[in-house]
Amino acid sequence: GEITFFRELDGDPVSHKYITGGPHNFRDGQSQIGNCQIEVYPMKPGPGMFISRYVESKGGGINHIAFNTADIENDTNYFKDLGCDLVFNVSVNGKTTENYIDTRKHGDLMISLRPSADKWENSWRRNNESHPLVSNWNFIGQGICVNDLSAASDYYSSLGFEKISEKKDDQAWSVSRQQFSLGEVSFELIQENEKSIYRNSLSQRGEGVSEIIFEVEDLESELLKFEKKGISALIVSGNKKKASIDTREKGNILITLFEKL
């Protein structure tokens, strides 16, 4: 197989090709949270170096989200036709197994496209989710801090994301929000109106993913579990159906939980 790396985080396009097989010079890992799998890096200089550049410049955080697609080439060309660069390509026997697309213009988040999950991958996911230490949380999506909510809204609309809500003020969280979706994943654009729980993320990284969002069966019981681990809720909604949890110690990412209706 081959890995072709087209861009750094900034600057002019580049092209470096690496032949895969045998020992590799990077490490990653997986963290299973409910039905959401988080890939844990960093990579060192080599085929995934743009991810290390992100860590070097902005610290820990989430820099891309991966989607399975039935036609990776067609969907890649869709984004390229909209002016989004191809950052990184992985192929095996000439067949693409992953493409990274530069969709960072507003929100600093890339999209990774992968082929449809095969029988082995689906079995692997079910095995991960069945582990006794894995919660039954349902992944909803990501909260993304932006500097200009209107511009970010226009950008996500131009990329073909479905607009789920209009812009609205959230006084309890001191932000304005607007929700989009791609497939079954929610992308909540967040603009800080005054000092908020997102200030740390904005100060360290600027725009970018600030939280991952889950639906849970019983919010109160989940908050008690966090309390026993010494982890506090930063904000709980007045109706006790939503809470943001301070899980920023590693990765500087909050967890927001909604109680299932």
PLM regions and their residue ranges:
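N-terminal beta-strand motif that seeds the catalytic metal site of vicinal oxygen chelate
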Residues: 60-68, 117-153, 209-212
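Short Pro/Gly-enriched beta-strand edge/turn motifs at strand-loop
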Residues: 9-18, 81-84, 158-164, 227
